Amino acid sequence: MAANNKKYFLESFSPLGYVKNNFQGNLRSVNWNLVDDEKDLEVWNRIVQNFWLPEKIPVSNDIPSWKKLSKDWQDLITKTFTGLTLLDTIQATIGDICQIDHALTDHEQVIYANFAFMVGVHARSYGTIFSTLCTSEQINAAHEWVVNTESLQKRAKALIPYYTGNDPLKSKVAAALMPGFLLYGGFYLPFYLSSRKQLPNTSDIIRLILRDKVIHNYYSGYKYQRKLEKLPLAKQKEMKAFVFELMYRLIELEKDYLKELYEGFGIVDDAIKFSVYNAGKFLQNLGYDSPFTAAETRIKPEIFAQLSARADENHDFFSGNGSSYVMGVSEETNDDDWNF
């Protein structure tokens, strides 16, 4: 960084830095023409390009498919999505917000503010699915189930102390764990159904959510590694031990939850393997090797195919609100443009 730029940052504060400095000093605005870390600009451009809203997805086209499902399957889907809503509520209101306080750059602060908003959109998306497909009784019962299901509550609460704790690195690990691992057990169900041509538009929403989660996990993993590399080797080893210990603890909580959730539907073992596979991917994103065997992470081909953001989409992406689109750019024309 040039000397003048260093002086600029040393003599001014971001709004959050101003608060931390006991409301002393001069405030600065975020300057996208002076980027400390090019990864910030790259990720910002990607998340803006990927912006979407659930109202643009024709979930109502899934009503015929929904009506063909038994009540047990309908209740399972509703419970699963309500569980995902809880996790996204935590991430939007605590997890990503806490990362603003630990940001390395001004731009990282606003990126996590954007993440928090989009995770709020994800939580709203499940509400869109509910209001389209479910009865009020099903929705209310599912939300009551979330409050009263201990296995779900345990896994949902597990990361909150690290979000709000005093260790920025542990908070960053937790911020990556939610989009990088903890949601995937719930994602398994819509991908399983989509591979069987059921609820295809609902699955499109899940793919859009997944596309965002991949970026959120990647960015948190990248920032974790940038923080970690500045630490002494002993601290790096300590953090690695922490990550693996927390990961294994969460896997056990996830297994307990998935066994309770999916019992009787014939998908428990495959859902667990799907989760463990993504646990390995999460560890790799933090710069560690996956310790899991091929047998522990074997995913059926039809499920693996659903991980593609372009898999079997069902609506018009010209408007730029699908998972395989490129945002259209409009330009006004004049008479001369049509003189061929």
UniProtKB/Swiss-Prot annotation:
Keywords: Deoxyribonucleotide synthesis, Iron, Metal-binding, Oxidoreductase
Residues engaged in binding Fe cation 2: H216
Pfam families: Ribonuc_red_sm
Residues reported to bind Fe cation 1: D88, H122
Main EC class the enzyme belongs to: oxidoreductase
Biological process according to GO: deoxyribonucleotide biosynthetic process
Cofactor annotation comment: Binds 2 iron ions per subunit.
E.C. designation(s): 1.17.4.1
GO MF annotation terms: metal ion binding; ribonucleoside-diphosphate reductase activity, thioredoxin disulfide as acceptor
Reactions that this protein is recorded to catalyse: a 2'-deoxyribonucleoside 5'-diphosphate + [thioredoxin]-disulfide + H2O = a ribonucleoside 5'-diphosphate + [thioredoxin]-dithiol
Record InterPro entries: Ferritin-like_SF, RNR-like, RNR_NrdF-like, RNR_small, RNR_small_fam
Active site: Y126
GO terms for cellular component: ribonucleoside-diphosphate reductase complex
Cofactor needs: Fe cation
Source domain of life: Bacteria
Quaternary context: Tetramer of two alpha and two beta subunits.
Alphabetized PANTHER family for the sequence: RIBONUCLEOSIDE-DIPHOSPHATE REDUCTASE SMALL CHAIN (PTHR23409), RIBONUCLEOSIDE-DIPHOSPHATE REDUCTASE SUBUNIT M2 (PTHR23409:SF18)
Biological role stated in the UniProt entry: Provides the precursors necessary for DNA synthesis. Catalyzes the biosynthesis of deoxyribonucleotides from the corresponding ribonucleotides.
Family: Belongs to the ribonucleoside diphosphate reductase small chain family.
This protein's name: Ribonucleoside-diphosphate reductase subunit beta
Organism of this sequence: Mycoplasma genitalium (strain ATCC 33530 / DSM 19775 / NCTC 10195 / G37) (Mycoplasmoides genitalium)
Gene that specifies this protein: nrdF
